[in-house]
Amino acid sequence: MVEKVRNIVVEELVRTPVEMQEVELVERKGIGHPDSIADGIAEAVSRALSREYLKRYGIILHHNTDQVEVVGGRAYPQFGGGEVIKPIYILLSGRAVELVDREEFPVHQVAIKAAKDYLKKAVRHLDIENHVVIDSRIGQGSVDLVGVFNKAKENPIPLANDTSFGVGYAPLSETERIVLETEKLLNSEEFKKKCPAVGEDIKVMGLRKGDEIDLTIAAAIVDSEVSNPDDYMAVKEEIYEAAKGVVEEHTQRPTKIFVNTADDPKNGIYYITVTGTSAEAGDDGSVGRGNRVNGLITPNRHMSMEAAAGKNPVSHVGKIYNLLSMLIANDIAEQVEGVQEVYVRILSQIGKPIDEPLVASIQIIPKKGYSIDVLQKPAYEIADAWLADVTKIQKMILDDKLNVF
């Protein structure tokens, strides 16, 4: 067997590392944010379709469900419990094979069930039957199964269905880690048991100026869990203390923590919701407007604008290459001594095998005292090994070992 020679380029990146830049901005939209709801549903639908295709036909058929829109409803929250006046409308769109050798595949049933199951898990106080309307308008496609199997035999490595690129980097900065871990803690099962009044719509914004960090948290509070303003303020204090614990674990930099800064108690303004998400009150959401595949929005870093959620896990490089870039970057940062920062960009060419990108660009900022010459070979080998086993990404996705937002 002839070994493939892949177009992997490893070079030194000459720029100021993020930790040494004067200003750093980092954002994470929590799982109950309308944009994250759209991402989560799109991905849940794709995974459900993939598993059902595999179960029935032994192969994942073509689909992309990365067009989900969340249209905000209207609610009347009040201490002790309010009500949703107009339900949130969720539109499922995209494409999926619905006709297989003249046999109909239940695309819409699978998609709607996946969306409902995801929402039940992601937004605890949302009444799926009364607070939400889910409409599936996923477009149809048909397929000749024999032809699909024959094509898969001819091309065991899937062919890229687009000319696109993915981007990843490592390691996370202190500010990035704090923002990510703060939201994860506040939306963890453990914290919800301790403080059930905190909804899932949590947005965390980190600003580092020099050596000082400002952490701003917007957290929707569930009105049925707080009887009065005093209860509400006690919940805010719980959020503050939880965030403080995360900060102390990850940095010694002086950090200020702000929670729900739009509150105006004198005028009776508090961030309370019926469901725990601002989608109940007119906030809309779309796939791809939120976190990148590492869970963050990072304007100090290279980023791809591609929406990974909902894209098929077989051949859509908009999903696969973003995840792959992140995994390669993580491994290089962890396994290669002397790497301060690493950035990975992988570009596909439509119709070409996904293990043979047009280029896999690896840019490294070496630590002081290290030369790029000693870092190139191990970085190359890590990237090459991942590309050789790129179809592993598909299994990792379906085994729920990878998140895309």
Swiss-Prot record:
Keywords: ATP-binding, Magnesium, Nucleotide-binding, One-carbon metabolism, Transferase. Pfam families: AdoMet_Synthase. ATP binds at residues 139-144. InterPro entries: AdoMet_synthase_2_family, AdoMet_synthase_3, S-AdoMet_synthetase_arc. Its cofactor is Mg(2+). Gene3D superfamilies: 3.30.300.10, S-adenosylmethionine synthetase, C-terminal domain. GO terms for molecular function: ATP binding; magnesium ion binding; methionine adenosyltransferase activity. Pathway: Amino-acid biosynthesis; S-adenosyl-L-methionine biosynthesis; S-adenosyl-L-methionine from L-methionine: step 1/1. It catalyses: L-methionine + ATP + H2O = S-adenosyl-L-methionine + phosphate + diphosphate. GO terms for biological process: one-carbon metabolic process; S-adenosylmethionine biosynthetic process. It comes from the Archaea. Its EC number is 2.5.1.6. Catalyzes the formation of S-adenosylmethionine from methionine and ATP. HAMAP family: S_AdoMet_synth2. Belongs to the AdoMet synthase 2 family. This is S-adenosylmethionine synthase. It comes from Thermococcus gammatolerans (strain DSM 15229 / JCM 11827 / EJ3). The lineage of its organism: Archaea, Methanobacteriati, Methanobacteriota, Thermococci, Thermococcales.
